[in-house]
Amino acid sequence: MAPKRNRDDDFVLTLSDNEGEDLTNAVEEELPLDPSSNKKRKRSDDTASTKKSKKSKKKPEEEDVEEEGIWGIKDADDGAMDSDFEFALEADGTGGADLEEFEGWGFDGAKKGLNGGDKKAVDIDEIIARRREKKKASGKKGEADDEVMVDQDDAAASNEEQDAPEGIDFEDEDDEFMAEDGFGMGAGSAEESGAEEDSDAEDDEEGEDDDSDNDSVASPAPHPDDAASEASDEDEDMDDDPEEAAKREAFFAPEEKPVKGAKQELNTTFQSMSLSRPILRGLATVGFTQPTPIQSKTIPVALLGKDVVGGAVTGSGKTAAFVVPVLERLLYRPKKVPTSRVAILMPTRELAIQCHAVATKLASHTDIKFCLAVGGLSLKVQEAELRLRPDVIIATPGRFIDHMRNSPSFTVDTLEILVLDEADRMLEAGFADELNEILTTIPKSRQTMLFSATMSSSVDNLIRVGLNRPVRLLVDSQKSTAGTLVQEFIRLRPGREGKRMGYLLYLCANVYTDRVIVFFRQKKEAHRARIIFGLSGLKATELHGSMSQEQRIKSVEAFRDGKASFLLATDLASRGLDIKGVDTVINYEAPQSHDIYLHRVGRTARAGRSGRACTIAAEPDRKVVKAAVKASRTQGAKVVSRVIEASEADSWSEKVDEMADEIEEILKEEKEDKILAQAEMEVRKGQNFIDHEAEIKGRPKRTWFETEKEKLAAKKLGVEELNGVVGGKKKGKLSNKDKKKLDDKGERLEGRVWKKGRQERDGKGVLAKEKGKKKVKGGKPPGPGGKKPMRPMRTGGAKRK
C-alpha cells in the first residue's frame, strides 16, 4: 500500500486533479516548522491512513475535510457546503457590519513601505496656530471673533442637518426657488435678474417641450453657440459611426445573445458562478452578498481566460469584478515554485493602495501573496517583497518600470494576466510611453483586462494594448452617473468670477458642513484654499501631487476618521477612490472635460447610497456643464440649481480679501520652513555619503527608458490632458518679428501713439514743417534747387529722417 500512497502524493501539485485529500495534505505539509520531527509525523500519518483504509473508515475522513473548509467535487457535498454558506450570510443580515468595516482605507500595506526617515513635514495648522498665539499675545482679537462666528454658523448648519430626515433633504427648499433659465443659476442680485428677464423669457419659450418635470429639475441653458455645437457633434457622430462600427465588429468578439432567460438567473449570486469556498468566504468577510451587474457579467467571462473590456458607472464594484476571477484562477496554480503571474496597473498611488487593500481582504482565506509597488514608498522594502516572487503585483506604471529595469530579482517573463484599471487614463498621452514600454516587455500570450467608468470606444487606442478578440462588457450607458446622485449647479454671472472663493466658503460654512470633497484644477489653488479654510476656522486637509506619500496618507486618514470635514484635492483623487461616507462633492470650477467631471462626482453616491455634487460654474465652464446636464437628462437623473444671495458671497469674498496679507505671510513662512527642512536633509545626505561612501559608489546606477527631456514632455502632455493647454506660446528665444509685435503691443497699452499716415510718407503733412525747421538749423545740406537728395547719395546704413 505504500507505493500507492506515494503516487497520490506525486499528483498533489497538478492542475487537473481534484481530490480534496491531496489539497489538505499539501497544506499540512507546509505548516510544520520543525524539520527534525517531519519524518516521524509522516510515518505516523502513513500508518494511521493504512489502518483506516483496512478498516474502511472513509466517512469520518470526509467529515474532517469538510470541517477544515475545503470541499470535494461530489454533488452531494457541494450542495451541503453551499447551503451552509448561504446560512452564514443570512445570519449576518445584509453584511452591513462587514461592509462598514471594509470601506475604510486600508493603509497597512502602504505603511509598511514608508521610508523610515525622520523628515518632518511643514504643517499649515501649526503655522496658523503659531500666528494666532502671536496675535493673542499682542492683543489682536479679531481672528478669534471671526472663529466664533464661523463656529456658530457650523453649529446652526449641523442642527439643521439633525432636524432633517436625511443628510441632503434639507436643501430641497432652496431647490424650489431656483431660477427658471436653462442653466439653472439665478441672478446674483435684483439688478442682474431684472436685466436678464428678456433672455430668461426666451429661454423658457425654447425649452417648453423639454421642461416636463417639476420645478426642481433644471434644463440645459440655450446659448447662441449651443445649437451650432450640437449640430457639429451630431455630424461628427454620424460620420464616425459607420467606420467605428465596422472596426468594433472586426476587433471585439461577437456578443453572445442569451437564448433562454434562465442563464441570467444563474449569476444572481456568487455561489452560482462556481467560485471556490475560500473566495466565497473572502466575499463574505468584505460584505458582498450579491454581485453587481458588472461583476455578474465579467467574472464568468474572465474565468474562461478571455480578454475583457469592461465599463460601468463609478461605485459599481469594478475592482472586485477583476480581482475575484484573478484570485479564483490563482487557486489552481502550481505552488511548488513561487511565480509572479498577475500585474494590476493603476494610474495613481492612492488607487493602487486601495486596490491592494481590497485584494488582500478578498484573499484573506487563501495563500495568495501580494506586493504593492508604487512611488513614494521604500524601494528596498519593495525589492525584498519582489524577491519572494509574489503572485500578484499591484503597481503604478512608473515604479513597475523602475523595478523591471533595476531590480535583479524581478522578472516579467512569467506574467499571465495584465489588468489596467482606469484604462482610459492609462491610454492618454501622459502614460502612453510608459504603457508602451511595459506592453513590449511582458509576454504577448497573456490575458488582458481593461476597466473604466468612461471606457474609450476608440478601437485605435485599444489595439495598442494588444488585446486578442476581447469581450466588450458595458453594463451602463457610457458617460452616465449613478442614479442616486443629485447634481447641483451654481451659476456665476459675468463679472463675478472673482467671487468664486466666497461662494465656496458660504457653501462649506452653511450648507455642506461635513464629509465634503472639494476638487480644484491646480495644486496651488488647493493649497491656497487650505490656508483660507484654516484661517476661517474650517477643518480641512489637502491632497495633491506636491505632497509626500506620508502626507497623503495622513491627510486621507484625517478625513476618513472625521478629524477633518473637508478634503481639498486635485484630480489626483478623482479616480477610483472609495472613501467611506462622502456625502457631497464640490467642484470649485468645472474640469477640463466631461469624463473628468464624471469621475469627480463619482466619489459620492457609491454602492447605491445617495449623494450630491455641486459645481460652481462660470461662462467658460458652459461646455462641460452643458454636456453634464444633457447626459443627466438622457439618463433621467436629477439636476437642480442653487441660488446664493450675492450679499452672502460678497461678505465672504471681503473676508478673503482681508486675509490676503496674512495668506502671503503664511506662504512665506511655509517656504522658509521648507528651505530649512531641505537644508537639514542635504546635511544628512552629505553626512551619509561621507560615512558610507564606498557602499554608495558601489551601487549600480538606476536606469530609465527615457531621457529627462522626454520625461518632461510626457509630463507636460499629461497636464494638458487634465487642464488643457497652459501658457499657449512656447518659451524660448524670440525672433525679431515677435519682438516687434511685443513692442507694438506695449506701446498700444501705454496709450495712443501717433503713427505716420500716407501724407507723412509722401513728405507732406506734419513732417513737412519739421523738415523745414531742420534745414534752417543745419545738418546735411539739401540737394540742388532745394530738392530732396538723390537716392544714390544715400548709404545703406543711413537712417531715414
From Swiss-Prot:
UniProt feature, compositional bias: Acidic residues: 18-32, 144-179, 193-214, 227-243
Family the UniProt entry places it in: Belongs to the DEAD box helicase family. DDX27/DRS1 subfamily.
Binding site for ATP: 312-319
Main location: nucleus
Protein name: ATP-dependent RNA helicase drs1
TM stretches of this protein: none
Ranges of residues in domain Helicase ATP-binding: 299-473
Superkingdom field: Eukaryota
Gene of this entry: drs1
Protein species of origin: Botryotinia fuckeliana (strain B05.10)
EC numbers on record: 3.6.4.13
Catalytic function, reaction form: ATP + H2O = ADP + phosphate + H(+)
Domain comment in the entry: The Q motif is unique to and characteristic of the DEAD box family of RNA helicases and controls ATP binding and hydrolysis.
Annotated PROSITE patterns: DEAD_ATP_HELICASE, HELICASE_ATP_BIND_1, HELICASE_CTER, Q_MOTIF
MF term (GO), any: RNA binding
Region (Disordered): 1-79, 131-244, 727-801
Keyword Iron: no
Function: ATP-binding RNA helicase involved in ribosome assembly.
Subunit relationships: Associates with pre-ribosomal particles.
GO CC annotations, alphabetized: cytosol; nucleolus; preribosome, large subunit precursor
UniProt biased composition (Basic and acidic residues): 1-10, 735-770
Short motif Q motif, span: 268-296
GO biological process: ribosomal large subunit assembly; rRNA processing
Ranges spanned by the short sequence motif DEAD box, renumbered to the chain: 421-424
Localization of this protein: Nucleus, Nucleolus
Every Helicase C-terminal domain range: 503-682
SUPFAM superfamilies in UniProt: P-loop containing nucleoside triphosphate hydrolases
Keyword check for RNA-binding: yes
